[in-house]
Amino acid sequence: NIQSYHHFMSVHLFSHVDIKPENIFIPKGDLMNDEVNDHCQKYDQKISDLGGIDFQLLGIGRTGHIGFNEPGSNYDSLTRRVHLNYITRNDARKSFYGIENVPTTAITMGIKTIRKSKRIVLLAWGQNKSSVIKKAIENEVDSNIPASFLQKHSNVTFVLDNSSSSELTRIKSPWKVGSCNWNNELKAKAVIWLCDITKKSILKLTESDYNENNLSELLLHQTTYEINLEIFNKLQRTITGWPGGKPNFEDTYRPERSNPSKKRVLIFSPHPDDDVISMGGTFDRLVSQGHEVHVAYQTSGNIAVSNSDVLKYVEVYESFSNKKDKELTSILKFNNEILNNKKIRKIAGLIREKESLGATRFVGIPDSNVHFLKLPFYETGSVKKSIPSASDKEIMSNIISEIKPHQIYVAGDLADPHGTHKVCLDIFFDVLQNLKSEKFMKDCWVWLYRGAWHEWQVHEIDMSVPMSPNQVLRKRKAIFYHQTQKDNVMFQGNDNREFWVRTEDRNLAIAKKFRDIGMPDYAAIETFKRYHF
């Protein structure tokens, strides 16, 4: 069964290593009810008979589960059948084409069986694991976070990436655990953190605030006044209503150059909606200020159109043209899974193209400035994508070389649950390395945007583009042109809000954050980080 963990492990691990089939032992998931207990007991006995587990490799779920030991699991639990938590099932819905198809029960190795392993390594990556990683490592041992039981093991290692480790004290606020090597970004991070702790704006922070919150080290070389003013100015200078640079204006302390006054701008959008979701206000501002703006949609996004949406458009066409495709409509009516059907994928891709054109026309750029790249790595017809090839890089390289942009905007939002953003960014970085020696690239600046899944931290921001209430509404309307991505989205991630709601909430939250630390009061703000190459 392609939706079983037998299949998952085979595709993602066993097919890549030289393991013998007879050395693979996975609990059976197709047993009758009266067979389960006996099977679980024999499974544990088999482990014992073979001398126990020398090395155990684990993942961790957002509930803190290891294996399928959900919150509330007993410290001495053995292999058994368990009821799956809603969050666990919701996280698996992509693989099962909807939560309604995800099993409600599973067989799991127990906590006692796991902790008997001589060596344990737990892997985690991604922003959505950061909160539970902090609880598992730093909080008290708690059965509601089963991974926290590993604190009692004498030989365990957590292997984490930057995102999953971001909430750990040693990463988020390292000044609380020891001396720091202070750079400008870390200093800004500390001061903004202090504002949060004290509920004060930057210019109201006192020497006592620093001393009482583990930040006295900052006062060794600067006064409180000097630090406050330095960080205040740093953040204030990120704010601009001119994302393409303000013409004929002194730009020493502005995030973008004033010249050339009219720039060629290239926005890379991994899916056909990320541009307006993540930087719709800035996109609109660049166009209204007279820059030559191009958008390049890197993938077709075709698998993100539901069969019911494709069917709707097919039926409209059939009614208009008096042409019928009974086989196609039958397939669409009676399947709710992703279909590897070239005709369906082509229709879905066209739907997303026309939605994109609706949005870009609303913003005000000509159709000739809209480029559908259809990168080949994406066109597998399934959630699993191909490894990017030279063809993907060539397509990206060609569009950059053709436009010769002064600005490139790229999605740096790596919390995308199905990884397309990361793949597109990796392709871009490879292309950038090959192109950076070109003469036109000497005048090109690269800006990374976020917003679809999470936002830049304030201390990371290099450019902040405020929006008025009217601009917030225009951005919302641009997003609404992507109708198939508005309701019942195929790849929602862990956030059940609609994309326009979540990005608007983030833009409003950033504006509030700026207001709280003493910056002007804006309706909303989009943020960017400059990538130096």
Model-derived regions, located:
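Short beta-alpha junction loops
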Residues: Q127, N162-S164, T299-N302, A452-W453
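Conserved phosphate- and dinucleotide-binding cores of soluble alpha/beta proteins
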Residues: I2-W193
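Conserved beta-strand scaffold positions in the cores of enzyme catalytic domains, especially
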Residues: I24-I26, R81, V295, V370-F372, ...
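A charged, well-structured terminal subsegment
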Residues: K20, W125, M467-G493
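Active-site beta-strand->loop->alpha-helix modules in alpha/beta enzyme cores, enriched
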Residues: L31-N33, T198-P272, V276-K442, L448, ...
